[in-house]
């Protein structure tokens, strides 16, 4: 670490902040109001602006990029084994919790998993339409033939963090489901292939993913994508693909 960086126990933070003086940078998008008040009470002059640590962290270096690739290849192997397992299960024998436990087991079997990236989202049928749904013993639904099964999951590895969403048709589904799936896939392909000039923001590219749905009078109320940490938070800013994102997209993000 740089000579100007000091590491201290979290328990010492309040005392250290109370002892500060002079000008202190505060990021209004992430600083808790209690910390802001503490600094003001200490007599600090607050300078509001982006956290200077966030952007360098978001732009991965060559080691982090190589680690991310390795982590994704490892995680993809576990995901492929899981999907093969799911395809081989007899119809009408699984619940959402069964699916979650199986997927986490395949990631554990890599021998490199440190933790899951977040509580696995596994929604069968109507539960798949609930944004950030988390299955519980009370909400646990049987996976039925004809369901769309949405699975949003990821793994934390020393060399990288993953976050992958897949929607699986459990047997035959209707034309409306096929159309929605296809249009989302078209948006994903468009985003994967797009090349853009330097200086564009997440909001400038977000529409490429939505355009196939817009053609059918459809849309989704949440963002399209987000940054991912390197063995850190699975949601890492400041970059996002959403209507509201004003962050310029930079190499390494």
Q: What name fits each language-model region?
A:
Residues 1-253:
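Active-site neighborhoods and metal-handling regions in enzymes and metal-associated proteins
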